[in-house]
A protein has these predicted regions:
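Conserved beta strand-loop-helix elements of the APE1-like EEP
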Residues: 46-62, 191-212
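Active-site metal-binding loops of divalent metal-dependent hydrolases
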Residues: 22, 132, 229
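Metal-dependent phosphoesterases centered on the DNase I-like endonuclease/exonuclease/phosphatase
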Residues: 13-16, 37, 109-197, 201
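Short, acidic/polar
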Residues: 1-11
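Structured beta-strand-rich core segments of catalytic domains in phosphoester-bond hydrolases
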Residues: 22-23, 28-96
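Surface-exposed cleft-lining segments at the edges of enzyme active sites
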Residues: 67-69, 94-110, 146-149
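Active-site beta-strand termini and strand-to-loop segments that position acidic
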Residues: 56, 81-84, 207-208, 233-237
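Surface polyanion/phosphate-binding segment centered on an Asp-His-Pro turn
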Residues: 218-237
Length: 237
């Protein structure tokens, strides 16, 4: 990881950093972040997918992936940390690919994630974050009219996110800012970021019992270094 990443890490000074699509194995990471516990879930295929969490607080337990991975390839997409009052789950949701070639698996994965989150929510509050690879509503991307059949804005993916929220979860950014237009991802093509032709596909979602604890949700679109920018949740726990 680059020196620029370390600078951003220290600048944001968060209690938890959740990273997606790290594309690395733990032995490839050379970071000197004192005071953070580090957790990695790496794909079997090197240089692909993968997730990581850096936490100032030691978790009570750590788990990786779904409990039942029978129908899921080992792509390193999920990390779950348990703390005294809440669970923290980060995920890199599978992309449905061009022409929605992977949509069936994507929807299967979404159903498994709802089951996973609901099983946690029965025990304590849940914070779910990451690259969720969906722009939920038309306000969440620059050009909705031409993207209804594209990965990330298909009716199926949007309905899956609606279903997640209907299970007792809140999109924290949209909860605070129902009409604000900001994006968290821009294609590398056609100078999309320069033109702000973006999508909001990175989220912090929380269980409804945390609604009154939400203080702020931010999209740090002033930070460069990736096709995504960091998103932040400030919550009183």
């Amino acid at each position: 990881m680059s020196k620029g990443f370390e600078d951003i890490f220290k600048q944001l000074d968060a209690d938890f950093f959740c990273l997606q699509e790290t594309k690395c194995q733990p032995d490839q990471v050379d970071l000197s972040f004192d005071g953070y516990y580090q957790f990695f879930n790496s794909a079997e295929r090197k240089g692909y997918s993968s997730t990581a969490i850096f936490s100032r607080k030691k978790p009570l337990s750590v788990s990786y992936d779904f409990d039942d991975m029978t129908d899921h390839p080992k792509e390193g997409r999920i990390i779950t940390l348990e703390f005294e009052k809440f669970y923290l789950v980060t995920a890199y949701v599978p992309n449905s690919k061009d022409q929605l070639l992977r949509i069936d698996y994507r929807l299967q994965w979404e159903q498994a994630m709802v089951r996973h989150l609901n099983s946690l929510k029965q025990k304590k509050a849940v914070i779910y974050c990451g690259d969720l690879n969906v722009a939920h509503n038309e306000i969440d991307l620059k050009n909705p009219d031409i993207n209804h059949f594209n990965a990330g804005f298909s009716d199926q993916e949007r309905e899956a996110f609606t279903n997640l929220l209907s299970n007792g979860y809140i999109d924290t950014y949209r909860f605070l800012y129902p009409n604000k237009v900001e994006y968290s991802w821009w294609s590398y093509r056609s100078r999309a970021r320069e033109k702000n032709i973006g999508w909001r596909i990175d989220y912090f979602v929380v269980s409804e019992d945390l609604k009154d604890k939400i203080i702020e949700a931010k999209i740090h679109n002033q930070i460069y270094g990736s096709d995504h920018c960091p998103v932040e949740l400030d919550i009183d726990l």
